[in-house]
Design a protein with these regions (language model features):
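Generic structural signal for well-ordered alpha-helices
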Residues: 29-33, 50, 79, 132-136, ...
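Extended, intrinsically disordered, low-complexity segments
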Residues: 235-272
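His/Asp/Glu-enriched short active-site or ligand-binding loop at hydrolase and phosphoryl-transfer sites
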Residues: 43, 50, 151-155, 178-189, ...
Length: 272
């Protein structure tokens, strides 16, 4: 089997029966995972991603599964499917929204994305976000890794009246890192930017805090030559057929398409 020249990274948020922004239905999500598993795609670990960017080898059909924010449906809808097909995934946590409490053995259908936002505004994040107990349960399976999505998910550069956005960003990332260390015993070197937005100063700050793999919402070929500071991701769609996913993975693993992808960067969605 030949080696991977580019690593496609799939970006998910919600998997729910309630349609809406950044949401796939359980049926579509399971169909995509079944197709990946049945087509011989290898879902990679964080350590394998780091080695890839250092020049290490991955099988040609390698893909990374990422989920942003830490929604409760990642526990109730995503995790059972990952177990069913033996797939590895990564969840970027907004650590300031993750609560305490026992594992929820039964979860009724979760709200839509807009409804989830309203719960959070009302101080009821626990109704729609993961708990540390559920995170530990998923982590112990060996199938799910957890990384930082900052502590607050704020775009400090857009906050009115803020004169020191870089200092606040540094504190935000640092607080997330320390919270993950306190609750999970460690924090990885992987960080996802809120709304996918970044610039060179952000990259510098993240590096100073120990983060080496930085995730965006841009469409790009991910190769060792491009480095791990601007990892692009493919925003997933609610499509019945696996053909859409097959075409996307072909494009993002075929070097001839790299120049085209560079001209068409993906949209930066709210709550990424």
């Amino acid at each position: 089997m030949s080696d991977a020249r580019s690593l496609p990274v799939l970006m998910y948020h919600h998997v729910s029966n309630k349609p809406g922004l950044v949401t796939l239905s359980p049926h579509t999500f399971r169909s995509q995972m079944r197709w990946l598993a049945g087509s011989g795609w290898k879902t990679v670990t964080a350590a394998e991603v780091e080695l890839f960017y250092l020049g290490g080898k991955l099988p040609r059909k390698s893909v990374m599964l990422t989920f942003d924010d830490g929604w409760l449906d990642n526990w109730s809808q995503v995790f059972p499917v990952l177990r069913e097909f033996g797939l590895h995934a990564h969840i970027f946590l907004i650590t300031g929204l993750i609560g305490d409490g026992p594992v929820r053995e039964r979860v009724d259908d979760t709200p839509s994305h807009r409804e989830c936002e309203e719960y959070i505004k009302q101080g009821l994040a626990d109704n729609v976000m993961l708990r540390w107990s559920e995170i530990r349960e998923m982590r112990s399976s060996g199938l799910v890794e957890f990384h930082s999505h900052t502590h607050t998910h704020r775009r400090w550069d857009l906050m009115p009246g803020i004169t020191n956005p870089l200092e606040l960003l540094r504190a935000d990332i640092l607080l997330s890192r320390e919270r993950m260390k306190d609750m999970l015993g460690s924090c990885s070197r992987h960080l996802c930017w809120p709304e996918g937005w970044y610039h060179p100063d952000y990259i510098r700050i993240a590096g100073e805090l120990g983060f080496t793999c930085l995730y965006t919402t841009e469409r790009r070929m991910n190769t060792p030559q491009h480095g791990a500071c601007q990892i692009g991701r493919i925003s997933t769609k609610e499509r019945e057929s696996s053909g859409w996913l097959k075409r996307r993975l072909f494009c993002y693993t075929t070097p001839v398409f790299s120049s085209l992808l560079a001209l068409h960067k993906g949209p930066r969605l709210s709550w990424n």
